[in-house]
Structure formats: structure tokens, C-alpha cells
């Protein structure tokens, strides 16, 4: 039985999309090399067990930073992570059999919006989720710009020259923003920051008020990232806990 029908529940779905260009390199060992070598895996394990050092002592990303896609912006709108590994489809395919790294890029203020809807009263049935990533001109333009920023850093900075980087994905010959966004989107992944499907506010399209009580109901509160009016310009875990 439906107690309260609110059309905005499940709307306004917002997430951070992680673009994953890949650069093949030389003269440097990456996690790809360790993954396919029994001896290197043993050494890596011993380093961690005995000294708490090595690749197992850090997370999947070795560095993180924020930057502007346009210098005229007041605050950074891109988040970068550097991972010393590469694969085609994250979580679905093995690491590449050559040394490479992945400088991931995330537009932390996307304008694309998706939806999540129930398909059945049975809660065991998975919902219908439509993310609509890169569905706006602005998001595609920023995606293209962000790929170019990474490309410029990797291919033109002195720090990377000893490793002779080669852009495998999306491809050095792709230069226009629209095509870059399309190609990068083929290998992109969520960074697991879905928010805003039960948006907080006082307007008629808001789902909860500033006390997190659902509009039209007195005994239901929603306390998770779905109540965020807008996605945060960074990771969502800490703001949710706060």
C-alpha cells in the first residue's frame, strides 16, 4: 500500500563519474608487473608482513589532487587520482600485461542527472537505475578538457620523460572534446558517490525538510547521502557522517 506518493523520490540522481585514461610506460615497475609475477607477489607480501611497507601498505590510488578545468573558475572542479595499474574494465577484466598507470579524472560538479525507480513492490527485485552520465554538453566539454589536461602533464612534463609514456586510451590522435568524452565514457566507472534522490529543501519538489523528515509524513526520516541538495565537490562519505 502506498502511504505517500512523491514524484521526486528517485529523481535528481547525481554521481561522480571516474574517467580512466591509460598510459603505457617503460623503465618503471607497476602493479601490472607484480600481478603477473609469482616471485614479485611473494616479495610484496613479505614487505608488508615484515615491514608494513610496499604496495599493500597503501590504497589503490597513490596520490590525489584537485584542479580547475578553466582558470577563471573560483574553485577546482576536477579531482585526480593516480593509480600505478591499468585495466580495460574496472572490476571486470584483469590488469594489463605491461607496465602502465591510470590517472583518473572526476568532474566533481556534474550537471547530468539520472533516476532510480522501483520495478516491483517486491523489495528483492533490483530497481531500475538510469545514471545518464555525460548527458549534458557541459559535462562532455569538461570531460574533454580534463583528458587534455592529463595528456599535457603526462606527455610534456620532464617528470614523465624517463618513462616514455604512450597514451593507450582514449588515444593521442583524438583531440576534440566531444569525441574525447565519448571515448573516455566507454571505459569510465562510478566512483561510488550517488546522492540527491531524496533531496532536502522546502520547495514542492524536495523530499525531506531541514530536519530530514519526509514531507507529508511525521514519522519517517531519511538520513543518508540521498538528502544532499547538491553533490559535494569531493568525496561524499565524510559529509554524510557529519
Language-model segments: residues:
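Glycine-rich loop(s) and the adjacent beta-strand/alpha-helix scaffold that form part
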Residues: 1-50
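FAD-dependent oxidoreductase catalytic-site/capping-region signature
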Residues: 26-29, 42-239
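Surface beta-loop-beta hairpin patches that serve as ligand-binding interfaces in beta-rich domains
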Residues: 242
Amino acid at each position: 500500500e502506498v502511504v505517500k506518493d512523491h514524484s521526486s523520490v528517485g529523481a535528481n540522481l547525481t554521481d561522480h563519474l571516474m574517467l580512466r585514461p591509460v598510459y603505457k610506460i617503460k623503465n618503471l615497475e607497476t602493479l601490472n608487473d607484480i600481478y603477473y609475477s609469482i616471485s614479485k607477489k611473494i616479495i610484496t607480501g613479505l614487505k608488508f608482513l615484515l615491514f608494513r611497507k610496499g604496495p599493500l601498505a597503501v590504497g589503490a590510488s597513490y596520490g590525489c589532487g584537485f584542479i580547475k578545468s578553466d582558470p577563471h573558475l573560483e574553485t577546482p572542479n576536477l579531482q585526480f587520482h593516480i593509480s600505478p595499474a591499468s585495466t580495460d574494465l574496472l572490476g571486470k577484466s584483469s590488469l594489463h600485461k605491461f607496465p602502465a598507470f591510470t590517472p583518473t579524472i572526476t568532474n566533481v560538479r556534474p550537471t547530468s542527472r539520472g533516476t532510480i525507480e522501483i520495478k516491483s513492490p517486491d523489495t528483492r527485485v533490483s530497481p531500475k537505475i538510469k545514471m545518464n552520465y555525460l548527458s549534458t554538453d557541459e559535462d562532455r566539454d569538461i570531460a574533454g578538457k580534463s583528458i587534455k589536461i592529463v595528456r599535457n602533464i603526462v606527455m610534456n612534463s620532464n617528470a614523465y620523460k624517463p618513462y616514455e609514456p604512450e597514451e593507450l586510451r582514449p588515444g593521442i590522435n583524438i583531440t576534440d572534446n566531444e569525441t574525447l568524452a565519448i571515448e573516455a565514457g566507454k571505459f569510465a566507472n562510478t566512483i561510488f558517490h550517488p546522492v540527491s534522490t531524496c533531496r532536502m529543501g522546502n520547495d514542492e519538489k524536495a523530499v525531506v525538510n531541514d530536519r530530514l523528515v519526509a514531507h507529508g509524513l511525521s514519522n519517517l526520516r531519511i538520513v543518508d547521502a540521498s538528502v544532499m541538495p547538491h553533490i559535494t565537490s569531493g568525496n561524499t562519505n565524510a559529509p554524510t557522517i557529519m
